[in-house]
Each structure stands twice: as structure tokens, then as C-alpha cells.
Amino acid sequence: MITLTGHTLTVEEMKRLLLEGEGVTACPTSMQKVAECREVVEKIVEDGKVVYGITTGFGKFSDVLIQKDDVKALQHNLIQSHACGIGDPFPEEVSRGMLILRANTMLKGVSGVRPLVVNMLLEFVNRKIHPVVPQQGSLGASGDLAPLSHLALVLLGEGEVFYKGKRVHAMVALTEEGLEPIELEAKEGLALINGTQAMTAQGVLSYIEAEASAYQSELIASMTMEGLRGIIDAFDENVHKARGYKEQVEVASRIRDILHDSKLVTKQGELRVQDAYSLRCIPQVHGASWQVLNYVKEKLEIEMNAATDNPLIFDGGEKVISGGNFHGQPIAFAMDFLKVGMAELANISERRIERLVNPQLNDLPPFLSPEPGLQSGAMIMQYAAASLVSENKTLAHPASVDSIPSSANQEDHVSMGTIASRHAHQIIQNARRVLAIEMICAMQAAEYRGIENMSTVTKTFYHQGRQQVPSITNDRIFSTDIENIAHWLKTNYSIKERLDVNAAL
């Protein structure tokens, strides 16, 4: 059980919450702050003070005063009118993450909701009732209005949820679980939808998957090094310390560990003086992608614990301030950076695939074919990889450089952070498939070299891979092989370890 405080949530905890289905509870001290802040909102309504989103309309309607008797209707209307999401729904892990992150930000005690609202969010998490949230429709400021409105709908018994493997009306799940829908009171609708939790939840899931792929890429690249009789000298610690990037040093160190007892890697001058860049520069390129991942993780953990509501309430109500913490620019930049980092991991992987299949670049059978000419072998797998990396180059165009005005120019600059987050996730899926193709080719190359000559770690990884796909003894439908390996890579990492096979290092 993870305790949410509003301040301490980590990516590692989110792994357990999203991928293991661990439950959540609220810190009592934080809940007390929520209750105290709520008293301020109720006093504002009672006194008839003019405060944005509590006693006024929203966006361009911020100058329209709302009567005390209409405050509840204002919040309900807000949720219904803003539930304009379109397209396919986010994965369940993402909508689960949105519930968790929205509760966590409320636990900072500056949003002004009742404890009841926080508890309802946590009930949905713990009972695995996940909102159906369309992926498209967010500008990323004022936060993820449309996606979070679909999240808020289900608390009211409206909209749809994923529940026990089915997509059902929210009331079906609430009734079965014995829960009553809530009625929103002053500010609560705004507090539910003003924030960056859609882009951040998708970003967290993307980061988790990207981190796993980055570790896996080192194992796969190591297997390729063996298949191509790569030169291990280029991974010498002195080379990488001389440059000074810790991530580069760490990648080189891990690959040295992976290949320490391999009989297939070579020494400088043994077969050739130096390798092509896609082998020789693995630490430099993969290390740079790790720099991206480290940056992204840092920004995500800040945003996961951030107050992104508006207005925010401080000093016991002495300050109720309209600000712009809902603006998704920090996450938009981070997601665009993640896109570039993962696209490059795929790019260099595709170049290694080419070196594995091109008979002009190695001494292996052409296209790793069992009968070159009669059978095409891995020829078209390289085409597929080339297609994926080219698609990634289009998706890697930064969403964050775009902006378009909304709400009659009141909201005249937006982040497009959710678009960046969604595209990052697609790039990661594509990159995983490219790595799957490299792994299939590297395993085949290793067989030509002799499995007995592989390192202990790569041999273990090879045998695990061969449980997913057989050797290429005849041409077959390789699409199935690629998807099988890609699915295995997606699920073949432990929550507590970097990667099952890597835990032995």
C-alpha cells in the first residue's frame, strides 16, 4: 500500500501502482490540510466574495458573477460541458495514473476540495474502477481540461469506466461496489479538471516503458556485438571517463559486464582496427538517451507532486491566488525530449540490423537466410525497422513549439503537452519493435557463430528469446515473431529489478 502525501510520490512507486495494481491510502496529516482548506472555500461562498472559479464563471466568463444558489450547478455544468474528449481511450494504466495523481495534488491542501472527493478518487483506484478517457482534445493549458472532465464524470456516476475487464457505464461499477456518486460543491469541479494529470500519467507510463527498453537495448546490442565479432576495446573505461558523461560511462560498464566472458567479441586489430559507429559508439549514443531519461524522470517527479490547480489557497485563506500552474509547458518539453531520446535508440538499433543482414558488411549468410536466394530470411525485417524509425522521425517533431489561442484569447498560449506525451508513447512502442527485430537478427547471427561461445548473460537472454520465437530455418510470417518478441520485451522486466536477466550482473 502506497501512502500519498502530496509531496513524496516517486516513479518507482508509480510502477507498483500502475503495473502491479498496488493500492493507495492518504496521509492523515495531508487529509487534515485538505479539510482545513475546504473550510476557506465554504466561507468564501457564505460571504459572497468574488473568487475565480468559486463564485465566477470560467475562462472568458471569469467576469460573470455566480449566485450562491447556483454554485453547485456551476461545477456540474463545468464537467459536462468540458467532457469533449474524442478518439480512442487512454490505456487503463494511464487513467488509473490520472486518478492517483489528481488525488495526490489535492493532498497538498491548497485546492479547496472536501476530503470526500479525495477519498472517492482513492476508492476508484483501490477498487480498480478506471475511467474511460478519450486521448484527444487537450491543449495542455488550462491543463488537461477535456481528459480530466471525463475522469470527473465517473465520480458523478456519469460516463464510462473499465471495470472487471469490461467497458461499462459508471453506475454499473458504482452499484456493484456499493458506492454512491458524489455531488460536486463549490470549486470541486474546477479542482478536478484544472491540471496536467493526463499528460503526466501518460508520461510516467511512457518513462517506465522507455527505461525498460533502454536497459534491454544494451543486452540486445551486446548480442549484436557478438554476432558481428565487435571490438570490445571501444568500451574500455578509460575512453569513457576521458569524456566525462556518467551515463556514457555506465552504459560502457554494463556492456563490459554483459560481455566479460564472451568468446565472440574481439580485440582491436584482431579482425579489424575499428568498428562502424553503430557498434563503436553504443555508449555515447545510448548514454545520451539515458541523459534524456534522467531529465524526464526528474521533471515527472516534480510534476507528480505539484499543485496544478487554479486558484490556489494559501495561509488559511488569506491568499486565494489565480495563477498558471496548470500550464503544461515543463512536461511538454520533457515529453518532446523523450521522443528524441527514444527515436535515437531506435535509429542506432536499425543501423545495427542493417549490419547484421547486409552481406557486404559482414561474413554472415546474406540476410541471415538459411538458403540465400530461395529464401529471403531477415531481408524485409530490416524494411520494417526502417519504416518504424522513419515514422518516429515524423512523430519526434516537437509538439511544444505549437500553440493556438482558445477561450476568446483569454487562454492565448497553450503547451500541447498531451500531444507530446501521446506521441512519445507511440515512439516508444515503435522503438520496442525495432529492438525486437534487432534481437531476432542478433539471435540468428549468434547461432551461426556458435551459442556456446556467447557470454553467460547473452546466452541466458538468447535462450529466453528462443522460447518466444524459433530459429529461422525456413521463411515464415515474421510479423508474428516481431510482435511476440516486442510483447515479451514489454512484459519481461521486474518492477524491483532493472530487467530479470540483468539482475544477475
UniProtKB/Swiss-Prot annotation:
Q: What is a single molecular function from GO for this protein? A: histidine ammonia-lyase activity
UniProt KW keywords: Cytoplasm, Histidine metabolism, Lyase
Q: What class of enzyme is it?
A: lyase
- Modified-residue entries (2,3-didehydroalanine (Ser)), positions: S142
PROSITE patterns on file = PAL_HISTIDASE (PS00488)
State the pathway, as annotated in the record: Amino-acid degradation; L-histidine degradation into L-glutamate; N-formimidoyl-L-glutamate from L-histidine: step 1/3
Q: Where is this cross-link: 5-imidazolinone (Ala-Gly)?
A: A141-G143
Per the record, the GO terms for biological process are: L-histidine catabolic process to glutamate and formamide; L-histidine catabolic process to glutamate and formate
Please give the Pfam families that the UniProt record associates with this protein.
Lyase_aromatic
User: Where does it sit, as one GO cellular component term?
Assistant: cytoplasm
Q: How is it modified after translation?
A: Contains an active site 4-methylidene-imidazol-5-one (MIO), which is formed autocatalytically by cyclization and dehydration of residues Ala-Ser-Gly.
Per the UniProt entry, the Enzyme Commission number(s) are 4.3.1.3
As for subcellular location, the record says:
Cytoplasm
Recorded catalytic activity of this chain's protein: L-histidine = trans-urocanate + NH4(+)
Tell me the leader sequence span.
none
The family database entries (PANTHER family) matched by this protein are listed as:
HISTIDINE AMMONIA-LYASE
Family, similarity comment: Belongs to the PAL/histidase family.
- Protein name according to UniProt: Histidine ammonia-lyase
Q: Which species does this protein come from?
A: Bacillus mycoides (strain KBAB4)
Phylogenetic placement of the source organism: Bacteria, Bacillati, Bacillota, Bacilli, Bacillales
